[in-house]
């Protein structure tokens, strides 16, 4: 019997990746990729052009496609659905003051947590809308609607004919959608932009939302973290730490979360459940930056880090190289503590960089635990998860076993799995197996986290 094929897309900050998989088994058939320019804002047309290049010749026998994409990006359009300005991305922190203002305008953090499950940060779409309205009022007057990156690409694949759609997972990262109530908070959208805006319709998790001009069915799509959870096959209680451009720690949950501290965002997942999540702006690029300082490649950097002992000889790096989201320090810079003549070695500096990256995410996992998540293991994914030093040092910072799934494009895989689900018209997701996962037992060293916490308090209170 002929295989039924589906495609999944990961449109991220730096690249686009496409996989084609067997709809029933998840077996990889073929793949492609393209690149995006680095930065904090981008013309969405670049995403579209790179996507169409990557899809060229790839979809001849594909029956359905799903789009996973970076969360939070602000794509604003006029009444003819023309893009009005370059999209502001999740890593653009110029809306930090707008976030503070919005928190006050709604009466404080508790009110935000009750209304949307999250307290807005500079990454959230709602804060970008406020910044845009205040700083570019002439352009803002032209705007009638707002979309997210995956909404825009899915809509473009329909030939820009259908009404834009989104899913509750990606919508929950905007700051104007309630995952627990499953609806937009239009009063918050108006609070941010001073007038009403059109927003994409919320599609069911396994819906078909349209077709391409070739007749390929389009799944609802979702945000990158939600898609990665799908690609991994994460279930309730599973904790995932993703180490890409940013770092995220999240768990699939049966219950919504409401964290007024703002550390954990109360997101939805892509299946009808919830995905409480904490995000750091700084992850894999910390390692690249540290390796550049040492004038070594990442392989040699990993060897240097492993040659040092837990605690890096007393060196502690707070790696806020691009500001930080968790903790909420958008204007912070990196800081190195504990330097002496004896401990300033390449080995200790390399290990301090890895420990600094992972300590922030260990704190994020602990925040999930405080909200009721009971992890049995932590799965490491993303580009930096393949680094041997990252894998080994992670066992010293998490209290539970560390799972290392095989290297894969889990966001694109999750989008493909969603497409297979929509194509099947079944109530249950297709059972795609993730094999060859390595499980590392914990070697927990609380003193490393304690030193990190002490350094943080000394500088940031």
Where are these predicted regions, by residue range?
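Active-site nucleophile and cofactor-binding loops and adjacent substrate-binding regions
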Residues: 64-69, 88-91, 116-124, 143-149, ...
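Glycine/Thr-rich phosphate-binding loops that ligate phosphate moieties of nucleotide
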Residues: 1-33, 67, 71-104, 138, ...
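N-terminal phosphate-binding loop and adjacent alpha-helix
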Residues: 29-61
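Signature tryptophan residues that serve as conserved aromatic anchors
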Residues: 47-48, 90, 112, 131, ...
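ATP-dependent carbohydrate kinase catalytic cores
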Residues: 169-274, 311, 344, 389, ...
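Phosphate/pyrophosphate-binding loops at sites that engage ATP/ADP/AMP, CoA/4′-phosphopantetheine
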Residues: 51-64, 135-140, 186-196, 364-376
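Short beta-strand-to-turn element immediately C-terminal to the catalytic PLP-Schiff-base lysine
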Residues: 21, 75-78, 132-134, 155-158, ...
């Amino acid at each position: 019997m002929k295989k039924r094929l589906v495609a999944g897309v990961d449109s991220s900050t730096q690249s686009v990746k496409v996989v084609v998989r067997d709809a029933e088994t998840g077996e990889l058939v073929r793949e492609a990729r393209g690149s995006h320019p680095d930065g904090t804002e981008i013309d969405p047309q670049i995403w579209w052009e790179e996507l169409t290049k990557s899809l060229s010749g790839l979809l001849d026998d594909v029956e359905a496609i799903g789009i996973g994409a970076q969360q939070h990006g602000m794509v604003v359009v006029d009444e003819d659905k023309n893009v009005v300005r370059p999209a502001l991305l999740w890593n653009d922190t110029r809306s930090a003051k707008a976030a503070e203002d919005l928190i006050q305008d709604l009466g404080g953090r508790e009110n935000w947590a009750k209304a949307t499950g999250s307290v807005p940060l500079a990454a959230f779409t709602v804060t970008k809308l406020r910044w845009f309205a205040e700083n570019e009022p002439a352009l803002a007057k032209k705007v009638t609607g707002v979309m997210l990156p995956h909404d825009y690409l899915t809509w473009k694949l329909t030939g820009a004919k259908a009404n834009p759609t989104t899913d509750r997972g990606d919508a929950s990262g905007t700051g104007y959608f309630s995952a627990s109530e499953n609806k937009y908070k239009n009063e918050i959208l108006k609070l941010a932009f001073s007038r009403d805006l059109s927003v994409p319709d919320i599609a069911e998790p396994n819906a078909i939302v349209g077709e391409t001009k070739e007749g390929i069915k389009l799944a609802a799509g979702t945000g990158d973290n939600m898609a990665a959870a799908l690609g991994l096959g994460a279930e309730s209680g599973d904790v995932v730490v993703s180490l890409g451009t940013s770092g995220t720690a999240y768990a699939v949950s049966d219950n919504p979360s409401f964290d007024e501290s703002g550390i954990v965002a109360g997101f939805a997942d892509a299946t009808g459940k919830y995905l409480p999540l904490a995000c750091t702006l700084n992850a894999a690029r910390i390692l690249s930056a540290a390796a550049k300082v040492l004038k070594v490649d990442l392989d040699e950097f990993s060897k240097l880090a492993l040659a040092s002992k837990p605690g890096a000889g007393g060196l502690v790096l707070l790696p806020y190289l691009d500001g930080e989201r968790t903790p909420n320090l958008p204007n912070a810079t990196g800081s190195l503590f504990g330097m002496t003549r004896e401990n300033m070695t390449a080995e200790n500096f390399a290990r301090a960089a890895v420990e600094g990256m992972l300590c922030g995410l260990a704190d994020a996992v602990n925040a999930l635990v405080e909200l009721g998540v009971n992890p049995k293991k932590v799965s490491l994914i993303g580009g930096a998860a393949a680094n041997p030093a990252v894998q080994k040092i992670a066992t010293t910072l998490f209290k539970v076993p560390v799972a290392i799934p095989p290297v894969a494009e889990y966001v694109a895989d999750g989008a493909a799995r969603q497409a297979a689900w929509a194509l099947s018209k079944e109530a249950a997701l297709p059972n795609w197996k993730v094999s060859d996962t390595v499980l590392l037992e914990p070697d927990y060293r609380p003193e490393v986290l304690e030193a990190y916490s002490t350094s943080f308090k000394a500088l940031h209170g």
